[in-house]
Amino acid sequence: MRYNEKELLCLSRQRAEKAAELGMRGPKKGSVLKKRLVKLVVNFLFYFRIDEEEPIGALLLEHCRVSKEDEKGFSIHFIDEPEKKYMFECSSQEQCVEWVEALTNASYEFMRRSLMFYRNEILKMTGKDPLEQYGISGESRFQLENASL
């Protein structure tokens, strides 16, 4: 997927849902753990050299798996490239659990499935589709038969 560099830079400067200095190791063999400022903004994970304003990279958190590796560590790997694994080291077990949860919940697909789940619950309780008032209930991305939590 292609992204406009200026748009990504602008997005990286927005308020982060989560940010911290974490140890990070890239997917290349022999890569060493380096301290990085890591910021979660919407469904992008930006990483920066400490004390620099421009990100050195970004991961789009779609079609990926976030896994807890050990007490303080987690990884991200992409379904279409399982051999490419990004490793992260947190300062505590609690911080690690928080990051895994935040990253898992950041994907568009997770948000869409959550929307479908709550839409279905409201429909059961009220008999009304809450998306009808916005004129979008018929769009394919909002169809209930495609959603399962």
Swiss-Prot record:
Coiled-coil annotated residue ranges, if any: none
Gene Ontology CC annotations of this record: cytosol; early endosome; recycling endosome; trans-Golgi network
Superkingdom of origin organism: Eukaryota
InterPro entries attached to this UniProt entry: Boi1/Boi2-like, PH-like_dom_sf, PH_domain
Name the UniProt record assigns to this protein: Pleckstrin homology domain-containing family J member 1
GO biological process annotation, one example: receptor recycling
Start and end residues of each PH domain: 15-108
SMART domains, alphabetized: PH
Cystine crosslinks: none
